[in-house]
Amino acid sequence: MLGCRGCHGKDLEGTFFTKNEPQYGPLYASNLTVEIPEYTDAQLDGIIRQGVHPERKTVWGMPSEIFQHLSDPDFDALVAYLRTLKPAGKKLPNPQFSVQDRKDIASGNYKPAAQLVRERANQLPVDLGAGHALGRYITEVTCAECHGPKLEGNPNDPVGRIPNLIVVGGYSRDQFETLATRGVPVGGRKLNPMMVSVALGRLSHMTPHERDALYAYLKARAEQPQ
């Protein structure tokens, strides 16, 4: 599910996204079970891959900067799945911006999805050839959301230090499997809770072939001259 449940909730019925951050919003991740039927496939493409809403025009919080790289078959499969959801719960309110939100927007710290799509369109992980195409693609549409478009990390992220994925060079395939499926890094050290959530909620649900490809790409990337 490409992490949809991380914001939209385990049942995709939406969440009060800023519930524990009263300085923001209130901002809600929409209830996909009731909103998906309201849009055509083309409109969903605009929202998900382009960051453009057919009514509100501007989309906030959607990681369209990475979803713009979704292949057409994967996008079609995602939409086909979303259209199988039975409506449940209620439609949630549109975004409402607090004073802090508006300050962040004015300073450029909080950007609309369409702007991020434009800014990051050509910022991609290094191309290591056809043999690593699948692994690179997976990083573009998953890892890049937190680790950045070139997977270089962010030592100053508010949620905690996010490393350059060159660190995977220090993992064996078995160690990477433990990290990806159980959220346990080399040495058993404490991992950022966000990464534990990503491992258990996303990476562990990939096929072994996909994790093989992801590891092979990240390992090869780590072995490139720095």
Q: What is each residue range found by the language model?
A:
Residues 50, 61-63, 94-95, 116-120, ...:
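Interaction-mediating elements
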Residues 1-10, 44, 78, 135, ...:
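The canonical Cys-X-X-Cys-His
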Residues 9-45, 59-71, 99-107, 148-178, ...:
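Gly/Gly-Pro-rich "capping" loops immediately C-terminal to redox-active cysteine motifs
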Residues 7-12, 90, 185-190:
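Proline-centered turn/helix-capping motifs that create local helix->coil transitions or kinks
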Residues 1, 104-139, 226:
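Electrostatic cytochrome c docking/interface patches
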Residues 54-57, 145-146, 153-157, 185-192, ...:
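Substrate-binding/catalytic groove segments of enzymes
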Residues 1-5, 132-144, 153-163, 205-209, ...:
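Sequence context surrounding c-type heme c attachment/ligation sites in exported
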Residues 42-49, 53, 66-92, 174-179, ...:
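C-terminal capping alpha-helices of c-type cytochrome domains
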